[in-house]
């Protein structure tokens, strides 16, 4: 009897300690932005409202999204947005606010996705790679000296996937890899160009790292990781150097931004006769990847679903305002989705409350701000 009482007291204290740890420990914050489409309306609407709410709830008119997230991931058009809001302006601050980034994408969209001049008998629609290259170089360079920024030149860890035809496997660009070796450091415009090389619209993009030792023949990252959230979660869980306090998903706070889900009507219409265009197949694959990842993460965070928030639009909203007013969707643990009472706008508001309560990110700035000595060199010196 006495033993049972002692055991109960021990477990009660352990439970209190665990609950106290869950309440007080600072979670690692992940922002993930889907690929898909060329306008980024859903992600753009969410980013604008996210930044607006951060500034409103902190009372800081200069606060930016990168201040409150520990890592940002993006694919396709989402990768361009992710790179813009994390690129270092040279003083340790983001090169673009979310408002500026969305404005640039909107203003230069016709140049990013400019139709390529083709012959009279060419039936396949292609986009101009030269035009996209020019815009990306212009956008992802330092304003003062025109320096083309690299993965190391980011104020927060960045993660962007593509599919490498040379190795027939996904290739994930990261600041962590870039800081370890110049062979894994790539210019940001090339990284964004790689993840947006949709097979039906662009030819594969061939490029090398800054030291010329690593080469890649890339196509759209959306084919394998249109929703890069799982890649970001895995990266954080296995990167103890940058995220030493993370032991499991219970230590994470995740915001995943979709880029609009197809209703499927158009795809069925095109494919009913047994013929599918390349673009149709790519869209179906990308949507399938995004939904699968969302379902997996819904299961992983089922014990505390408020730690994982997915913002998506079901093809109904055509403007940013309509996207934010749509009711949110939540993946259920054993399949299916539930329509929530809260709108996408309200869900972002609630998420920002938790962000602000946990304070600004305490991760170190861009590796380029420090000595050129790598962690490996430091370890060897010891």
Residue ranges and their predicted role:
Residues 1-382:
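Conserved catalytic cores and adjacent C-terminal regulatory segments
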